[in-house]
Amino acid sequence: NYSIHIYMAFASIMKIFLPKDRVFYGLFEEVSSNLAQMSDIFTKAIAEKDSTARHNLLKSLEEWEHKNDEVTHKIFIELGRNFITPFDREDIHYLATSLDDIADYLWGASKRVMNYGIDDIDDVTQDFANIISKSIKALNKAIYGLRDMKDIRSLTEACVLINSYENEGDDTLDKGMMHL
């Protein structure tokens, strides 16, 4: 009987030290999926010709941004709760913060389009929206690839693709600046 209590105590202690990697991966995947939804809505809004419909689409991103804030908060809570993590604690914190920044930037861009009453959406802005969407789809692939680190090739390809979209975005920014 005494050995059962020792075993149960040991099992309880071990739960504290065992990694909760499924928790972190699931939360990162949730944030990434939310970002994909946000980029789809943003791209659709930028392509929308009707200003009222565009405004409604852009306004809907606020709710998505708040959802991402909640999930990011859960990641930070889990980070504080778990002694062992699937990868470096600082990397988890940095990734969570960076993903949250993307949601913040999408919502910020949406607010500026609404607040400044931008109705004439040019080709450069539409190109940017498409680049953002492609980048987030590649990011989504990379985030889902974290769970299975055995497929490093696919993860690396997604990261290279994200970098190429960043370069495409830089070129599009230069193009937009020339039109000012």
Write out the residue ranges for each language-model feature.
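Cytosolic, long alpha-helical scaffolding segments
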Residues: 8-180
